[in-house]
Regions:
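HAD-like aspartate-dependent phosphatase fold
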Residues: 1-167
Length: 167
């Protein structure tokens, strides 16, 4: 690489200069997102009581926004484990739902959970799928809209510094 014409070099310094307490931050984000969903999007107040469980998801998951599922997949798209909301899907049902054990990760319905700061999004999506399925009387949005609402309030919380100002 010829760097003679390069004037500036940037570095991604996350986890280099600072050690994050991801569990504490994600827990805070979870509560903050719940409040915004209730106050700004009209979600039922019942969701404010949803507990945060840091160990319920891991990085490397894929959210299937069309079906309300969380998938652990290989880099080749092979489904290893799947959950509908927070409930595990058995292998036979998984094969039926996905017509085998592979998914096309370029499909617009699949959203990767690929950073430590997206864990609260995945946790909350799983929980809201459970609430939607268990309480149809609440008239919650469909699965794609649930995910869209969660991502939008997360992005807004980062843009307006409302989340960081709490820290």
């Amino acid at each position: 690489l010829n760097m003679r014409k390069i004037k500036y070099v940037g570095f991604d310094m996350d986890h280099t200069l600072i050690r994050y307490n991801s569990q504490a931050f994600e827990g805070l984000a979870h509560q903050h997102l719940l409040k915004r969903l209730v106050n700004e999007r009209g979600y039922p107040e019942k969701i404010l009581k949803l507990p945060f469980d840091f160990n319920s998801v891991i990085r490397g998951l894929v959210i299937d926004s069309a079906k309300g599922n969380l998938l652990k997949v290989s880099r080749h798209g092979a489904i290893r484990v799947s959950h509908h909301g927070t409930k595990r899907i058995d292998y036979r049902q998984q094969q039926k739902d996905y017509h085998g054990t592979y998914v096309d990760l370029s499909d617009k319905n699949f959203v990767a959970v690929d950073t430590a700061f997206s864990l609260s999004v995945a946790i909350l999506f799983g929980q809201l799928v459970d609430v939607k399925d268990a309480t149809p009387e609440h008239k919650m949005p469909d699965y794609p809209q649930l995910l869209s609402d969660i991502i939008e309030v997360m992005d807004l919380s980062h843009r307006d510094d409302s989340l960081k100002s709490i820290v």
